[in-house]
Curated annotation (Swiss-Prot):
PANTHER family cross-referenced by the UniProt entry: PHOSPHOGLUCOMUTASE 2B-RELATED, PHOSPHOMANNOMUTASE 45A
Keywords associated with the record: Carbohydrate metabolism, Glucose metabolism, Isomerase, Magnesium, Metal-binding, Phosphoprotein
Residues at the catalytic site: S135
Name the record gives this protein: Phosphoglucomutase
This protein's record includes keyword Metal-binding: yes
Similarity comment text for this entry: Belongs to the phosphohexose mutase family.
Class in the EC hierarchy, top level: isomerase
Any GO molecular function: phosphoglucomutase activity
Keyword set includes Phosphoprotein: yes
UniProt xrefs under InterPro entries: A-D-PHexomutase_a/b/a-I, A-D-PHexomutase_a/b/a-I/II/III, A-D-PHexomutase_a/b/a-II, A-D-PHexomutase_a/b/a-III, A-D-PHexomutase_C, A-D-PHexomutase_C_sf, A-D-PHexomutase_CS, Alpha-D-phosphohexomutase_SF
Length: 548
């Protein structure tokens, strides 16, 4: 196989990446195959069916084209791409193949964000959408995310069907690619300015007026697509007291100034915080490269900083919506099953229904789609820094949330309060819930076997008490059963299957799941206990004690 691929190296678009890789890494590209799942495909550049290159992208595009042509008489699609290496090139390859098959393509003429893609699909009423991005992954990654007509990522069944169309094509080097220049020109359309304007209008209508205050904000796009759209939104809202971290607001597919362009990582804020100290700014905001996720840090008058966790941000946004907006009757908050107790209990305290879904925003989008006529969408979030305050987009949308948190902070500042003060108010109202995502890596060939064995062991035997906390129930999302410890009764869980175990206590929950991309077991805690750090460590020791 390798010899055959080497003949195509010069035209693969990835020769320079391949040449810089270790022999072991190069070989792995020929031994694996990119798998299309609910998040599309994501991978590293290189040669072979297991890497991103011209030929694996052509295969993907042809599979999607065949799927769309079989499903509709006149299919159409929107294609956006971010600033990563080869994003633009992949977008044009996909466009040429789809248009040559008679599919109408709205192609962005410049980099765009993921939320804009979701909005554009809905606004233009296309059959599907494609976003070329790898979100916050390292620089040598890229990916193709596929969206349905509702602007949400594909569900499980549709993803499996599209994957079958792709797999039916066989070897990426032996495809019948028939590009038709006449059809390419006929079926390729520029994105109208009206799409952008309508999206901005939706956000300004959502936010309303940002009150005048002496709030100072520092913003970093972490080298991604947040500029110019975030400053443009703030300009439309007449908020001017924002300072950009110029170095990090330069487009850079290498993300040169950060170890990880991920607002979950504290290190990503270092430059912005230094600028905030220099300017005596109050709020430091970062978005990830495709601007679907965001995080923020608050700086007090003494120069002390507080990093807000993903679930804390979700709870703060719920508090803002409850206190400063007109909340309709039968409002609904949607969150993932690992997104913490704080926001959930706050919403429930105010008679807002909370619906919990599996991890992944596609499940949130499905829950939005399934709301009945009596229910009103209020807010959705995941603990991994993804939020949605209005459903004109059906994926997480940091472009909505940045001005929303600025507005909330401005209101609080005029009241002599901070976001940290608001968080303390939530704690006083519903309890001192704290959240902590943890994980353990299992290296080597045996890693996955160890993870499976650990999950099996937990499924077979969970004690009545863990780290001094009485177990109320155990939820197994593989068997879709909830077992109550006290009377040993069971009830069904009405969610799709997933390899997740959640253990419920009066004080909160812990949850475990294997990572889908790494040899890692992820571990979530959300607990209201006095000695949180000690209890967290005791639970960790119980779960992983035999593997240390």
């Amino acid at each position: 196989m390798k010899d055959n691929w080497m003949k195509y190296k010069d035209d693969s678009l990835v020769a320079s990446f391949y040449d810089s890789q270790t022999t072991t890494f190069q070989e792995q590209g020929f031994e694996t195959e990119l798998a299309f799942g609910t998040a599309g495909i994501r991978g590293q550049f290189g040669l072979g069916p297991g890497r991103l290159n011209r030929y694996t992208i052509q295969r993907l595009a042809l599979g999607i084209a065949n799927y769309l042509k079989d499903k509709e008489d006149n299919p159409s699609i929107v294609i956006h791409y971010d600033i990563r290496h080869l994003s633009s090139e992949f977008a044009h390859i996909i466009t040429q193949i789809l248009t040559s098959k008679g599919i109408k393509v709205y192609l962005a003429d410049v980099y765009k964000t993921t939320p804009q893609l979701s909005f554009a699909v809905r606004y233009l009423q296309t059959s599907a959408g494609i976003m070329i991005t790898a979100s916050h992954n390292p620089k040598d990654y890229n990916g193709i995310k596929v969206y349905g007509a509702d602007g949400a990522q594909l569900d499980e069944d549709t993803s499996l069907e599209v994957a079958q169309y792709i797999n039916n094509l066989g070897n990426p080097l032996e495809l019948n690619i028939d590009l038709n220049q006449e059809l390419i020109e006929k079926n390729t359309f520029d994105l109208q300015e009206a799409v952008y304007d309508s999206y901005i209008n939706e956000i300004t209508n959502l936010i309303g007026d940002i009150p005048q205050s002496d709030l100072k904000v520092v913003y970093t796009s972490l080298h991604g697509t947040g500029v110019p759209i975030i400053p443009d939104v703030l300009k439309h809202l007449n908020f001017q007291n924002v300072s950009l971290v110029e170095l990090q607001c330069e487009l850079d597919p290498n993300f040169s100034s950060v170890k990880s362009a991920n607002p979950e990582e504290r290190e990503a804020f270092d430059l912005a915080i230094q600028q905030a100290h220099d300017l005596e700014a109050n709020l430091i905001i970062a978005t990830d490269p495709d601007v679907d996720r965001m995080g923020f840090v608050e700086r007090d008058t003494n120069g002390q900083t507080y990093y807000f966790g993903g679930s804390e941000i979700g709870a703060l946004l719920i508090k803002y919506l409850l206190e400063y907006t007109n909340v309709p009757n039968h409002s609904v908050v949607i969150q993932s099953i690992v997104s913490g107790e704080l926001g959930k209990r706050l919403a429930q305290q105010h008679e807002v229904t909370v619906k919990e879904v599996l991890i992944g925003f596609k499940h949130i989008a499905k829950a939005i789609r399934e709301l009945d006529d009596t229910e009103s969408f209020l807010f959705a979030y995941e603990e991994s820094y993804g939020y949605l305050a209005d459903d004109f987009v059906r994926d997480k949308d940091a472009i909505q949330i940045v001005p929303l948190i600025i507005k909330y902070t401005s209101i609080l500042k005029n009241e002599g309060k901070t976001l940290h003060d608001a968080l303390k108010e939530i704690h006083r109202e519903v309890g001192q819930y704290r959240d902590k995502p943890m994980s353990k890596v299992f290296e080597g060939r045996e890693g996955q076997q160890q993870i499976n064995a650990l999950m099996d062991k937990l499924r077979r035997n969970i004690p009545d008490v863990i780290a001094g906390l009485k177990v109320i129930a155990v939820e197994d999302y593989e068997t879709l059963k909830r077992n109550y410890k006290e009377d040993n009764t069971e009830e069904a869980i009405s969610l799709p299957q997933a390899n997740v175990i959640r253990i419920l206590f009066k004080e909160g929950f812990i949850a475990l799941r294997p990572s889908g991309t790494e040899p890692k077991l992820k571990f979530y805690l959300s607990l209201n206990v006095d000695n949180f750090e000690q209890v967290s460590q005791d639970i960790y020791n119980y779960i992983f004690g035999d593997t240390e």
